[in-house]
Design a protein with these regions (language model features):
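Membrane-embedded beta-strand positions in outer-membrane beta-barrel channels/transporters
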Residues: 14, 69, 109, 129, ...
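Transmembrane beta-barrel architecture of outer-membrane proteins
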Residues: 43, 47, 67, 97, ...
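Extracytoplasmic beta-strand/coil segments of soluble accessory domains associated
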Residues: 49-88, 108
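A beta-strand signature from Gram-negative outer-membrane beta-barrel systems
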Residues: 102-146
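Periplasmic-side early beta-strands and strand-to-turn transitions of outer-membrane beta-barrels
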Residues: 131, 139-142, 163-212
Length: 212
């Protein structure tokens, strides 16, 4: 026989589980797959999803030239979260024509988080999280210049990418521009009409360090 003389209320302390959106794989406790764009063929790296789909469990839903929607372990649309420089992007979840509207220009690496710890990023990250890490500022005292030119014979198109970055004292800066001009896609039966596309983009940033 069990009896209880007094009613006792036990209140447990609240537990809060958080994770910063700007935390990269080097500081994370999560299982993360990482792709460094330094090791990717520039032709493949032209389109972000072409590169990310090389990672295990990641594929691309493609409905036409330049359109690629991420799919992680079969889940996509509003089941995949994309974070660029700590900011959630809300431009690819809806229709199948809404691809990942991010160029690989100026991107240093991409990290993909999969598994049950997606709950740290919210219920809409059930498929996983794609974290995009931009190229780092340089600590060199002078300006650094790089250029990449690509010719696509199938589209009879060109891509020109120019980057400038440098540092002076505690101040660092970066600038990158890219221009893409592709014609209609060529198939064995001839050109496919209305598959041409153009893209112009500009990225810039400035950083000031209080200690250096």
């Amino acid at each position: 026989i069990f009896s209880q003389v007094d009613n006792e209320l036990v209140e447990l302390e609240e537990i809060v589980l958080t994770i910063p959106f700007d935390q990269t794989v080097g500081k994370s406790i999560l299982k993360v797959d990482k792709l460094n764009f330094d090791n990717v063929n520039p032709i493949i790296a032209q389109y972000m999803m072409n590169s990310i789909s090389k990672l295990p469990g990641v594929s691309s839903i493609t409905t036409g030239p330049g359109i690629g929607k991420p799919s992680i372990r079969g889940l996509s649309f509003n089941r995949v979260v994309v974070i660029d420089q700590g900011i959630r992007l809300e431009n690819q979840q809806w229709g199948e024509e809404h691809g990942l509207a991010i160029s690989s220009s100026g991107v240093e690496s991409v990290e993909v988080v999969k598994g049950p710890l997606y709950v740290l990023y919210g219920s809409d990250a059930m498929g996983g999280v794609i974290y995009i890490e931009p190229e780092k500022y340089t600590s060199e005292c002078c300006a650094l210049i790089d250029y990449t030119g690509i010719y696509n014979s199938n589209y009879n198109g060109f891509t020109n990418n120019l980057g400038l970055k440098g540092s002076s004292g505690k101040l660092s800066w970066t600038f990158r521009g890219e221009m893409t001009d592709n014609g209609d896609f060529s198939s064995p039966d001839g050109e496919v009409e209305n598959t041409w596309f153009k893209n112009n983009e500009l990225k810039s940033g400035i950083q000031y360090q209080t200690e250096k």
